[in-house]
């Protein structure tokens, strides 16, 4: 009997295994850059490379490359220094936030050492240099030297000298601390180095002699570890089955740092880097690009914009550059002065089905909304959008709703605003201060950062005071009324809390289950249920693989459910359980993975390709119901347990589906091997 079961399983496994494998629900993935080599360390046959604040290793024997990230080996990201200890055979990985990992270079096992990261220290915690001596690492920081036992993985001593130590060394049984500010200090290794009085000044500052690693650099420069060119992802858009990204971070004179203008496009696991050596062509620095917009009809025809005007690319090459001198675009006005082409502010673009490109020209004397059709630019100047002698200074988030109206926001503290533009009538309506909620209470908004339409046609607004939403009926109102979702406390009182009240929302996306993903400036990312009443997930850099709590952009691959998350430390993704729906469920578009389910698999089994709110039943070959529920968008997940909480036995299980109105769909099969 057992033999017959395995023969049947083997036959059916051949049928179901034709479907490709997919990432499991809940999986995290990192897309890290490794282009800028910063430090190199040799460890036997391995060469460890710190590049773009990330880490990879090259094997001299077989020429293989191993990349490392927070997803699979490391405990953090954004590396400041690496250093190898030959005695302990461990690599010290120091992060910019002062966290420390110790990696065994024989098997990649990693020990986290968070003591220094968690320590409360008055002054600069930056590690300026690392010196290896025996099994110890000496870390030079703003107040002295930290002695770290690399073999035991613990901090042995801290020598508080009271001044910044730039580097140190040990020779002739003496330890030397070199400080640009205080000169050179020395103490005998046999002395009590914890006693500040044992250290004496012996001279002025001497710069260190750097080890010649030119040959290693030559070798490393030829390696191709993959990944994007930069870790900057201020703006992202998923379209044409590709992720289009740019670095951005500039809005109306507000920029935390200057970022390269490079456009990076992800297709599957392959990156295409658009031409970025264009300064000699345009005459201006190519940087601070905060919007990329592919032609809706042509994935290889792409527009980009930001601080210095509008750029047009075909097949990754620059074909046109539009500025104030060769087009109707206008430069920004600053304190009554019209600036040059270094400040032609175009923060948002939108390509529509009719072949038009819509352009927002911020802080300009006359311009605000511009239409491009057949390479011709047409101005739709709006006096409503002008204040202080120029247009709104940070117009961004351009989108089209299901009625064909254009919406965008002004992300500036002087005039935070929500704008609706109707192309057919060339009319604009702007909603600005004072804002009130549905109860008439005034909302003190400082920034309105983003706007998205959900599947029920509500328009969600991300602000520094949390998320709000409006309906298109607001166009008939004379007041700027925003709805704040109230979440009942369910504690026996009638009290409720505003949904993410006071949380600074920087970006958002709506998935195919009508759930909202909210990115924040310093609190990670939230997933809120379709009815807005439940917090499904709150991912932070502490409780998950999220790279950083500072979220700059979110984009979703609706076909797979992969949620791309751009942070200030790079790009990662989370495989969610909501995908695009199918109007009809057939054997060609409904399938399950992993399939077969092998004995060592303990994750969720995913059924995808379903219709919206599809009814799903999973039954055994004997007809016994083992699981049932409704889909999230086009996806349903099953943990492999029956209705009584028991793991199901080996066998073939039928997935029966029906639409939300009861019309039966298709049947797919799942093979489970225990």
Residue ranges and their predicted role:
Residues 1-27, 356-358, 674:
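Bacterial Sec-dependent N-terminal signal peptides
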Residues 13, 584-617, 635-638:
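Glycine-centered coil/turn sites that cap beta-strands in beta-rich domains
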Residues 21-590, 625:
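Carboxylate-rich, polar loop motifs that coordinate divalent cations or form catalytic acidic clusters
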Residues 70, 631-663:
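Short, surface-exposed loop/turn motifs with a glycine/proline- and acidic-biased composition
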Residues 297, 352, 401, 600, ...:
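Surface-exposed coil/turn segments at beta-strand junctions on protein surfaces, enriched
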Residues 325, 384, 632-633, 671:
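A generic structural motif
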Residues 615-626, 645, 653:
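Short, glycine-anchored, charge-dense loop/turn motifs used at functional sites
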Residues 665-670:
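Edge beta-strands of extracellular beta-sandwich domains
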């Amino acid at each position: 009997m057992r033999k017959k079961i395995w023969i049947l399983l083997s036959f059916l496994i051949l049928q179901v295994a034709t479907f490709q494998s997919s990432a499991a629900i809940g999986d995290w993935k990192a897309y890290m850059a490794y282009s800028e080599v910063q430090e190199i360390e040799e460890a036997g046959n391995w060469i460890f490379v710190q590049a773009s604040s990330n880490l990879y290793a090259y094997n001299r024997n077989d020429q293989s490359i191993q990349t490392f990230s927070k997803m699979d080996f490391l405990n953090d990201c954004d590396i400041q220094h690496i250093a190898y200890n030959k005695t302990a055979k461990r690599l010290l990985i120091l992060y910019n936030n002062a966290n420390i990992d110790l990696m065994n270079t024989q098997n990649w096992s990693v020990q986290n050492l968070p003591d220094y990261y968690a320590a409360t220290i008055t002054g600069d915690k930056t590690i300026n240099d690392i010196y290896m001596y025996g099994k110890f690492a000496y870390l030079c920081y703003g107040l002295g030297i930290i002695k770290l036992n690399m073999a035991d993985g613990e901090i042995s001593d801290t020598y508080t000298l009271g001044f910044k130590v730039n580097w140190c060394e040990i020779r002739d049984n003496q330890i030397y601390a070199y400080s640009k500010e205080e000169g050179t200090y020395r103490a005998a290794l046999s002395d009590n180095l914890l006693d500040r009085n044992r250290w004496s000044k012996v001279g002025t500052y001497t710069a260190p002699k750097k080890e010649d690693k030119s040959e290693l650099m030559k070798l490393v420069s030829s390696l191709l570890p993959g990944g994007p060119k930069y870790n900057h992802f201020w703006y992202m858009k998923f379209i044409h089955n590709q992720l289009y990204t740019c670095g951005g971070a500039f809005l109306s004179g507000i920029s935390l740092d200057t970022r390269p203008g490079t456009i990076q496009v992800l297709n599957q696991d392959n990156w295409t880097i658009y031409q970025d050596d264009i300064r000699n062509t345009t005459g201006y620095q190519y940087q601070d690009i905060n919007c990329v917009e592919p032609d809706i009809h042509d994935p290889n025809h792409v527009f980009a914009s930001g601080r210095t005007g509008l750029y047009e690319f075909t097949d990754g090459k620059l074909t046109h550059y539009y500025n104030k001198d060769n087009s109707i675009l206008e430069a920004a006005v600053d304190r009554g002065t019209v600036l040059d082409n270094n400040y032609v502010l175009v923060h948002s673009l939108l390509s529509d089905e009719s072949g038009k490109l819509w352009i927002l020209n911020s802080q300009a004397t006359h311009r605000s909304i511009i239409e491009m059709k057949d390479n011709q630019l047409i101005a739709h100047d709006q006096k409503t959008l002008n204040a202080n002698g120029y247009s709104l200074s940070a117009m961004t988030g351009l989108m089209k709703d299901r009625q064909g109206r254009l919406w965008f926001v002004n992300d500036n503290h002087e005039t935070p605003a929500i704008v609706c533009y109707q192309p057919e009538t060339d009319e604009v309506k702007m909603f600005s201060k004072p804002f009130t909620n549905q109860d008439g209470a005034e909302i003190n908004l400082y920034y309105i950062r983003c706007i998205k339409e959900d599947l029920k046609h509500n328009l969600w607004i991300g602000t520094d005071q949390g998320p709000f939403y409006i309906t298109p009926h607001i166009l008939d109102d004379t007041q700027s009324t925003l709805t704040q979702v109230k979440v009942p406390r369910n504690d026996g009182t009638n009290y409720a809390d505003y949904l993410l009240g006071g949380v600074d929302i920087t970006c958002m996306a709506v998935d195919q289950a009508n759930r909202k993903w909210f990115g924040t400036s310093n609190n990670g990312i939230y997933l809120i249920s379709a009815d807005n009443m439940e917090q499904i997930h709150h991912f932070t850099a502490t409780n998950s693989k999220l790279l950083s709590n500072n979220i700059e952009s979110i984009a979703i691959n609706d076909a797979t459910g992969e949620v791309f998350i751009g942070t200030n430390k790079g790009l990662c993704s989370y495989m969610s359980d909501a995908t695009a729906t199918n109007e009809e469920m057939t054997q060609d578009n409904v399938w399950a993975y992993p399939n077969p389910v092998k004995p060592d698999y303990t994750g969720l089994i995913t059924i995808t390709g379903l219709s919206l709110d599809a009814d799903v039943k999973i039954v055994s070959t004997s007809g016994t119901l083992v699981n049932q529920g409704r889909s999230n968008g086009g996806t349903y997940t099953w943990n492999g347990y029956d209705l009584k909480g028991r793991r199901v036995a080996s066998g073939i299980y039928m997935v029966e589906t029906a639409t939300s109105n009861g019309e039966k769909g298709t049947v797919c099969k799942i093979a489970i091997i225990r």
